[in-house]
From Swiss-Prot:
N-terminal signal peptide: 1-26
Record organism: Bordetella pertussis (strain Tohama I / ATCC BAA-589 / NCTC 13251)
Protein name stated in the entry: Outer-membrane lipoprotein carrier protein
Family that this chain belongs to: Belongs to the LolA family.
SUPFAM superfamilies: Prokaryotic lipoproteins and lipoprotein localization factors
Quaternary structure annotation from Swiss-Prot or TrEMBL: Monomer.
Amino acid sequence: MHMIRRAAGALAVFAVAALAAAPAWAATAQEQLDTFVATVKGATGSFKQSTVSPQGATQPAQSGTFAFQRPGKFKWAVQLPYEQLIVSDGKQVFQYDPDLAQVTVRQVDQAIGTSPAAILFGAGQLSQAFAVSALPDRDGLQWLRAKPRNADAGFSQVDIGLRDNQPARIELVDAFGQTTRVELSNLLPGAVPASEFQFTPPQGVDVVKM
């Protein structure tokens, strides 16, 4: 169970970052990414997430809400089947598991690494870290793929599907061959209050700094 929770936390970072990577479908995928990173500063929405192993085994589906604000701030709040909160204030990433009474704290750079989060939080050229390409349309969505150039990124690829110029689905294949699908809804671009990204560990919980 603890391993599943840790994996879910890492995938939450992937999902928020991949969301921020999805631009309006216009020119090339690279041009769209560059434009989106330069112009979209934040958004809120809802998600449903499921993970399937290479053998077809499924983990319990998750659902909740998210928010992000460039650069470096995000909130991923799992509501079902169990509560979990992941918050970045731009410097540190806090993962809070209420039923474990534990908060894990990591530096943003350590938590993000070379994941798709670099698309959201990074300030450099995307082409330095990712190979971005267009994919054929499917399921009524337009798709692009981002593949990390770093072999130690922890995932092999992330695909982003768009509808009506908004991200609707993210499909990430991790280093173990697991596929995580995140369905996005109620997406509302716009500034998010700084208070959304503030987190103080509740009194009495264990705080583990990584």
